[in-house]
Amino acid sequence: MGCMKSKQTFPFPTIYEGEKQHESEEPFMPEERCLPRMASPVNVKEEVKEPPGTNTVILEYAHRLSQDILCDALQQWACNNIKYHDIPYIESEGP
C-alpha cells in the first residue's frame, strides 16, 4: 500500500531504464564537446551620444536633500546617545 503519487513513475530515466535504451535512440546530450559561442564581428557604426549636461537645479536639490538626511541622522544619533549614555557597553568575549 502507499499513496498514488509514490506509485507513479519517475519522469526522468533511471539507471535501469538507461540500460534498456535501444542503440537506435539518440542520447539526450550529444557526445560532442560543447563550445562557447563566439560573437561574430559586426561592422555597424553606432553614434555615441553624449549625455546631456547636468542640470544645476537637480544638483542643488540633491545636495540640499543629502544635507537634510545627514542633519536628521545626526540629530537621531544625538537623541539616542543622550537617552542611552548611562548604559555601559559590554563587549562579548565569546563567539
From Swiss-Prot:
A lipid is attached at G2 (N-myristoyl glycine). One of its GO terms (cellular component) is plasma membrane. Keywords: Cell membrane, Lipoprotein, Membrane, Myristate, Palmitate, Phosphoprotein. Pfam families: SmAKAP. Belongs to the small membrane AKAP family. Interacts with PRKAR1A and PRKAR1B. This is Small membrane A-kinase anchor protein. It comes from Homo sapiens. The lineage of its organism: Eukaryota, Metazoa, Chordata, Craniata, Vertebrata. The gene is C2orf88.
